[in-house]
Amino acid sequence: MKMSNMLISTLREVPAEAEIDSHKLMLRSGMIRKMASGIYNYMPLGLKALKKVEDIIREEMNEAGAQEFLASAMIPAELWQSSGRWDAYGAEMFRVKDRNERDFCLGPTHEEVFTDIAKNEIKSYKQLPVNLYQIQTKYRDERRPRFGVMRSREFVMKDAYSFDKDQQGLDLSYNKMYEAYVKIFNRCGLDAKCVEADSGAIGGSNSAEFMVKSEVGEDDIVFCTECNYAANIEKATARLEEAEKEELIEVEKVSTPDSRGIDEVSEFLNISSKKTVKTLLYNVDGKIVAVFVRGDREVNEVKVANASNASGDIEMASHEEYMNATGCGIGFAGPIGIKADLILVDKEVKNMCNFVTGANETGYHIKNVNYGRDFEGTIGDYRNVVEGEACPTCGGKLTISRGTEVGHIFKLGTKYSEAMDAKFIAENGKEAPFIMGCYGIGVTRTMASIIEQHNDENGIVWPLAVAPYHVSVIAVNVKDEEQVKIATKLYEDLKSMGVEALLDDRNERAGVKFKDSEIMGIPMRITVGKKIVDGEVEFKLRIGDMEVVKIEDVCQMVKGEFDKNNLKLR
């Protein structure tokens, strides 16, 4: 591509709206332009980079035996209603009506569509396994779009769905996708780590996320410093401390006027917050759920929602619901005598002795409460882990980092096939539901994450495999016919080798051309200037020192970079 013919407009200043490196650099390099909140146009340079990521994904998916197709982005409500998710998905779904008042949505995800296709097209176990995928634009009405394409309302996603006849088949399909994802992110030059995750609105049993560490990430990721344990904070657990061994003491109600919070109660009673248990009340599908965790812990609402079999988001109980359940003011609720439809007790509480809780009476708490003797409930893990706790696998130290999700794989099982009556004829001649898996990659988010991990003060530093262009050939003075002639010859030679090259033949100062090449992140630069009188040009990697080389050798130097990166020229 000759830059004199290219639609490109780089920015020297950082746009005020941009908060993170990828957003700043995608705007400054001319990759994207904002259309509306969370909605972007992909300019030629941005689209070319996006297609590079898509091509890698497509190659690895095809290699893993998946078949590409393209589903409709507009989905009739009936499909979502058949799975029970039309109401459960929530406000993020863009819902529309046609002229006949029929309900549709712009697909935020495509489980129902793929399941419906399998239901109609796959009749026998002899046709299984099948893995279908698409690369398509998705739509989600994010409450707060931010960070450019990292969290936008319109984004490109690769979603794949496997259909198997049994659990063993699903395990094989899941493992194939895991291996494909590892290859995809490695080829993209992205340092992504697979972590245990919650299935969220997608549902199903097992799931894992591919996360990239990022200071601006929206998820907390828990890692063990000693072993390979890693999990999203929504899923992470810690090794349970040994049970306290104390002689049980009779309960005692004590006056705690104006002491509502854990810190206030602990100070008033001169005890550690670790000797208290706090109460949180939730409304889950119209039922009141009481959750009890140690006073210094934070409730994990995802774990609570899963334990409560919530159909959607859960919310804190209203003041009226709180009063009906406890009969007291805020800050004085406790487990003894509470009126709740479901009582969830964190397993850590079960191991505590003689702790303090609210008395369900305003101005009072109860000392020396013990689980089993004084109250009971459903024991489980309902809290967030904290930095420094013991790893559940090896006992090592847990550490927490911020991260961004770029991929997610699920074992759906029969969640959708049973709900939508999607069945096949099994080997025994009877109908059976498909055993499904779901595998997603955020393509636009992956591209932005690559930029987050590969940049410097001068701009993007694209890995060679995903760079929109491999080489920038710069004619320093376009009024010098010999410079233009040699630059054009090198440009054509590189193209004939399969190298994607830019010829900067613009009538601009050399400094402008160099800065544009750097901010765009082009991995290699060949500068054709005054040294051509000696048969030489300058060769420079995006990060590296400039070398003066013979004109006849420079194309082989470019090829050598492909060899170093184990990349084939097309």
UniProtKB/Swiss-Prot annotation:
Annotated compartments: Cytoplasm
Q: Which reaction does it catalyse?
A: tRNA(Pro) + L-proline + ATP = L-prolyl-tRNA(Pro) + AMP + diphosphate
Disulfide bridge partners, by residue number: none
Question: Mind telling me which residue stretches traverse the membrane in this protein?
Answer: none
Q: What is this enzyme's class at the first EC digit?
A: ligase
Any GO BP annotation: prolyl-tRNA aminoacylation
- A GO MF label: ATP binding
GO terms for cellular component: cytosol
Instruction: Output the HAMAP family linked to this UniProt entry.
Output: Pro_tRNA_synth_type1
Q: Which family does it belong to?
A: Belongs to the class-II aminoacyl-tRNA synthetase family. ProS type 1 subfamily.
- Name of protein: Proline--tRNA ligase
